[in-house]
């Protein structure tokens, strides 16, 4: 059994000498037994209240891919040799990409040179990014999006990628 200390808290107001129910004037200080209740964030409480007040109908619900089971027919979408074009009916926002992997400073310089001279050969570039779960001494990435596979092929045949930067082909959903 855990020990805990108590302290006396003076009662506010005049003292009553009549026949009243006695209230405790002690409160616990320090560790107590049992788990301590955590406060919920206000946003979470408001969201839960809104969900109870305004339940979603099937027509207003949004579909998230993460909550759906894996569709075996769509696993080929990760294959870069996949015959699907951009605008595949099941993935209309899918676009071809190139992930450039290497030294962060080299990637930044290369991205800057691309923006100055080869802007028509790609659609968008990301900032330099890393995987957060890896160690500090890991390589960085820059992702380049294209409007079509032919644009990506033209980019790869035209642009000389500096040594030390690895090119990884793929495609991914575009976020607008």
UniProtKB/Swiss-Prot annotation:
Location (main, coarse): host cell
Residue ranges the record marks as coiled coil: none
Gene3D superfamilies, A to Z: 3.30.70.330
Bias (Polar residues): 18-37, 46-66
Record-level GO BP terms: regulation of DNA replication
Keywords in alphabetical order: Host nucleus
Pfam families registered for this protein in UniProt: PPV_E2_C (PF00511)
InterPro entries attached to this UniProt entry: E2/EBNA1_C_sf, Nucleotide-bd_a/b_plait_sf, Papillomavirus_E2_C
Similarity comment text for this entry: Belongs to the papillomaviridae E8^E2C protein family.
Signal sequence segment: none
CC per GO annotation: host cell nucleus
Intracellular or extracellular location(s): Host nucleus
Record's protein name: Protein E8^E2C
Function: Plays a role in limiting the replication of viral DNA in keratinocytes. Recruits the host NCoR/SMRT complex to viral replication foci to mediate repression of both viral replication and transcription.
Region annotation Disordered: where it falls in the sequence: 1-70
Keyword Acyltransferase assigned: no
Annotated GO MF terms: DNA binding; DNA-binding transcription factor activity
